[in-house]
């Protein structure tokens, strides 16, 4: 909402006003659709429309796009009024989304951990939502108590972030590395983060999952090419 320190809608709308692109995309948390934000949501959409854009809004789930994480996000797409083609959101029904264990098996076993297979069997669901950093969520860890309990069910210690994968004789509940967190967020395995651990985890946790962004971007491009 208007009072949230993380609200970047005013800046994003300012950029649209100054640059007047053919299309723009915005994303926000699922709570943006809550009834208590109806007035603010309409204010944002009307502000975009007043700049000469048609607006589209939809809730997309990252796990429908192959991301092994529960991450629903509201995606707003604005198409300039002179573009006549109609924008369509991607379907995103991906039945091949891996579990956390399947996605992280190679990274978690990088140091020959003897307990790997048992862990993979336990981590047989998608991950809870990865959090970034703010005054409410510091780092590096995997979120508040309720989130850590969800991670614990997957055999993951959410109280911190490890520097490397478990050793061969490791006994206990492993922590994720920043590379593992990035993979769960949908980043390619070759992607590197030059920052220190806390800053890197904050960037990763605040990111919009790349596979979802790509899918929406492809549909925006299709709309612009067909106009």
Identify the function of each model-found stretch:
Residues 1-152:
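Class I S-adenosyl-L-methionine
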Residues 108-227:
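C-terminal target-recognition/interaction regions appended to catalytic cores
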């Amino acid at each position: 909402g208007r009072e949230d320190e993380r609200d970047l809608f005013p800046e994003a709308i300012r950029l649209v006003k100054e640059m007047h692109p053919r299309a723009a995309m915005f994303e926000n948390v699922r709570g943006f659709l809550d009834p208590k934000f109806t007035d603010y949501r309409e204010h944002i959409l009307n502000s975009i429309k007043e700049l000469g854009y048609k607006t589209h809004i939809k809730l997309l789930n990252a796990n429908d796009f192959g991301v092994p994480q529960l991450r629903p996000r509201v995606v707003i797409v604005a198409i300039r009024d002179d573009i006549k083609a109609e924008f369509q959101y991607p379907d995103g029904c991906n039945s091949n989304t891996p579990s956390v264990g399947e996605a992280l098996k190679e990274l978690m076993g990088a140091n020959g951990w003897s307990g790997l297979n048992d862990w993979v069997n336990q981590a047989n669901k998608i991950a809870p939502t990865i959090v970034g950093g703010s005054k409410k969520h510091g780092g590096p860890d995997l979120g508040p108590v309720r989130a850590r309990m969800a991670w614990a069910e997957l055999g993951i210690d959410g109280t911190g972030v490890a520097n490397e994968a478990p050793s061969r004789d490791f006994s206990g509940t492993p922590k994720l590395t920043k590379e593992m967190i990035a993979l769960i967020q949908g980043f390619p395995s070759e992607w590197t983060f030059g920052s220190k651990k806390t800053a890197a985890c904050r960037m990763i946790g605040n990111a919009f999952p790349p596979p979802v962004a790509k899918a929406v971007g492809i549909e925006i491009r299709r709309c612009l090419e067909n106009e």
